[in-house]
Amino acid sequence: MKQEQLRACQPLQFDRFVHILEQGQLNHAYLFSGNFGSLEMALFLSKSLFCSEKNGIFPCEKCRNCKLIEQEEFPDVTMIKPQNQVIKTERIRELVSQFSQSGIENQYQVFIIEQAEKMHVNAANSLLKVIEEPQSEIYIFFLTNDEEQMLPTIRSRTQIFQFKKQVSTLISQLEEVGLVKNKAKLLAKFSQSQTEADKMKVSASLLGF
């Protein structure tokens, strides 16, 4: 997702993070509640850390690092996702063992945990000390669409940002690809994330919907 699309998707949160980056105050642990642009924001922030040709705090989106991060292949940005509907304790313990190490290509490391509410309780507990006392330049982004299912101890130790669904933004974007308003409203109603909306836009265009 391009930066202007992310700003349109979540203008308040985008501007807040621009200010945070400009002040050099990026926290080491965030909880992103809601999946409308949350993954895209985590990737944007990762690019801002690793981009080799930034314009101020803004990543270029074109350098090797930016492209690898977008493709989820950059070695210092680790993506964690559920397997069989659970994020196992063993996977998080492997993660914790990396926290005391420097990055491969930089001093930073970024960990993005998708559907973080699906972490086993022991897995979540194993992260508490690391969140409280990070031993290296690490940044952890917990992404969840069900904040209430996250352990209270995780919620209390992270900065929480809301990524609520922006129906009006979705409708506008769907209309931009040629959908009439009532069809745009219908697709916007059933799309649960910005990524899903983008896929729907492409499908709708190909099918002549």
Stretch-by-stretch model annotation:
Residues F74, I92, A124, E147, ...:
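ATP/adenylate-binding site constellation spanning eukaryotic-like Ser/Thr protein kinases
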Residues D15-L21, T89-V110, E117-K118, N122-V130:
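Conserved alpha-helical scaffold flanking the Walker A/P-loop in AAA+ ATPase domains
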Residues P59-K88:
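AAA+/P-loop NTPase substrate/partner-engagement loops
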Residues Q25-L26, E70-F74, I104-Q107, P134-E137:
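Short loop/turn elements that form and flank the Walker-type P-loop nucleotide-binding site
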Residues M1-S48, G56, N65-L68, S136-Y139, ...:
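Charged, glycine-rich active-site and insertion segments that engage polyanionic ligands
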Residues M79-I80, I113, F163:
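Conserved beta-strand positions
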Residues V110-I112, F141:
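Structural motif
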Residues S48, S52, V130-E133:
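Active-site catalytic microenvironments for nucleophilic, acid-base chemistry
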